[in-house]
Amino acid sequence: MAVIMRIIQQFDPSCEKEFMDLEKQFAALEKKRPDFPTGKRLQPISAGEPVNALIWQHEFENIESAYMTLDFFGGDREHEDLFSKQAGYIKQVKIEFFRVLDFKE
């Protein structure tokens, strides 16, 4: 069962530039490292999340793969170094999982 994992980070709106500059470094890290899952980044315009949020999402084959990715992020030094710089701008983090529905016959 395919699963979409979303990591939603609400950041301090007065620090949007600094937060996004660090997020660009995360995107560069994904491109540089083939072991990193490549996520799609979204910022709400009109949604259930505030406009000062960044959503990273990726589709996984199953929920186990999604959980393994969270473990990977937590254990990767480059990721942790960047996250430690970004964490001061983050007000809230949520992680959501969605089952991908496929009604093809």
PLM regions: where:
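Functionally constrained cores in energy, signaling, and assembly domains
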Residues: A2, R6-Q9, E23, E30, ...
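Short, well-ordered beta-strand segments in beta-rich or mixed alpha/beta enzyme
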Residues: V3-Q10, G39-G74
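Short amphipathic alpha-helical segments
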Residues: C15-R41, G74, E78-L82
